[in-house]
A protein has these predicted regions:
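Hydrophobic targeting segments
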Residues: 1-4, 29-30
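Active-site acidic Asp-centered loop
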Residues: 4-6, 54, 61-63
Length: 178
């Protein structure tokens, strides 16, 4: 498990350090720093982790998702031979204010339903909260640098996968975004 933070002052850093210390048998590391890869801060932050990863599988997950213990199993469960990427729209939970409630209403009604319907029709598209890749697919399309050529990495991910004749699939259960 590779955790990435752009700055040591990131609010998640103390939690990640505690998790690593509490689970010494799990191979994990925290990488801090920013590489100017593109105009996308998320990709700039993830680049060091992408370079450090040695697995054939890569999962890019936003830090504001609540992940169940079977997160990776759920992503793998929908993988097929013609899959290039597995993603999942988030479910908005626990809004703290009016604008949080608006975000939850959007995520949990229009956005999630359209995305799930598209997936059922074989036209699934990525949501940047969860991007589960086979490394060879991402690298064949130009790697993280290719994702940075578009404003949104999820749109670029969908295009990269489809350009290779592969499909984006969605996890069968969504993940909470408080």
């Amino acid at each position: 498990v590779i955790f990435c933070a752009a700055r040591d002052s990131d609010a998640a850093v103390p939690l990640v350090r505690r998790l690593i210390a509490d689970h010494p048998k799990v191979r994990s590391q925290l990488l801090i720093g920013d590489t100017r890869l593109s105009g996308n801060p998320k990709l700039n932050n993830l680049f060091k982790g992408y370079e450090a990863a040695t697995s054939d599988w890569l999962v890019m997950t936003d830090s504001n998702l609540l992940l169940d213990r079977d997160y990776l199993r759920r992503l793998m469960a929908v993988w097929r031979e013609d899959t290039g990427l597995v993603s999942a729209p988030p479910v908005g939970t626990r809004p703290a204010n009016f604008w949080g409630a608006v975000e939850c209403a959007f995520l949990n009604s229009s956005q999630a339903r359209w995305q799930l319907a598209a997936d059922e029709l074989g036209q699934g598209f990525a949501q940047g909260k969860t991007l589960f890749w086979r490394r060879e697919v991402l690298e064949a399309g130009g790697g993280l640098a290719a994702l940075g050529r578009k404003l949104a990495e999820d749109v670029a991910s969908t295009r990269l996968v489809r350009a290779q004749g592969l499909r984006v699939r969605l996890a069968q259960r969504l993940f909470a975004q408080p």
